[in-house]
């Protein structure tokens, strides 16, 4: 009976020690595979990112105007600021209405000037 216990204990200790060694080996393999996958994926992601930024930066002639003010809306005559009038409108000082609130408003461009 003692020999069976000793044999069982010996087999159990060997199985546990070899099993842990396999787990460490599996962890190392997983870590290596992960780094290899990251190294393969990184150039593809950088290329995709560059293409997306390139598409955003290129404006086509059909692209719509960004954030502009409509007719009779307060504006700023300084073109560097964001409060500019849409195409077909110009930023002028108001004649009667709006003189109490803002200095300039967007009006339709006069073609006779």
From Swiss-Prot:
InterPro entries for the chain: Toxin_22 (IPR012627)
Q: In which tissues is it expressed?
A: Expressed by the venom gland.
Q: Which residues form the propeptide?
A: 22-67
Example GO molecular function: sodium channel inhibitor activity
Signal sequence bounds: 1-21
UniProtKB keywords: Cleavage on pair of basic residues, Disulfide bond, Ion channel impairing toxin, Knottin, Secreted, Signal, Toxin
Cellular component, GO annotation:
extracellular region
**Major subcellular location class:** secreted
Q: List the disulfide bonds.
A: 68-86, 75-91, 85-106
Query: Can you say where in the cell this protein is located?
Result: Secreted
Q: Known Pfam families for this protein?
A: Toxin_22 (PF08092)
Q: What is known of its domains?
A: The presence of a 'disulfide through disulfide knot' structurally defines this protein as a knottin.
Q: So what family is this one in?
A: Belongs to the neurotoxin 14 (magi-1) family. 02 (HWTX-XVIc) subfamily.
What does this chain do? Answer: Probable ion channel inhibitor.
User: What protein am I looking at?
Assistant: U10-theraphotoxin-Hs2a
Q: Organism, per UniProt?
A: Cyriopagopus schmidti (Chinese bird spider)
* Higher taxonomy: Eukaryota, Metazoa, Ecdysozoa, Arthropoda, Chelicerata
């Amino acid at each position: 009976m003692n020999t069976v216990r000793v044999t069982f204990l010996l087999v159990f200790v060997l199985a546990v020690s070899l099993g842990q060694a396999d787990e460490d080996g599996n962890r190392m393999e997983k870590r290596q595979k992960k780094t290899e996958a990251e190294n393969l994926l990184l150039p593809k992601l950088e290329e995709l990112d560059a293409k997306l930024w390139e598409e955003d930066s290129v404006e086509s002639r059909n692209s719509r105007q960004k954030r502009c003010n409509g007719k009779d809306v307060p504006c700023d005559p300084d073109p560097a600021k964001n409060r500019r009038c849409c195409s077909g409108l110009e930023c002028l000082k108001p004649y009667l209405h709006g003189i109490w609130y803002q200095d300039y408003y967007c009006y339709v461009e006069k073609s006779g000037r």
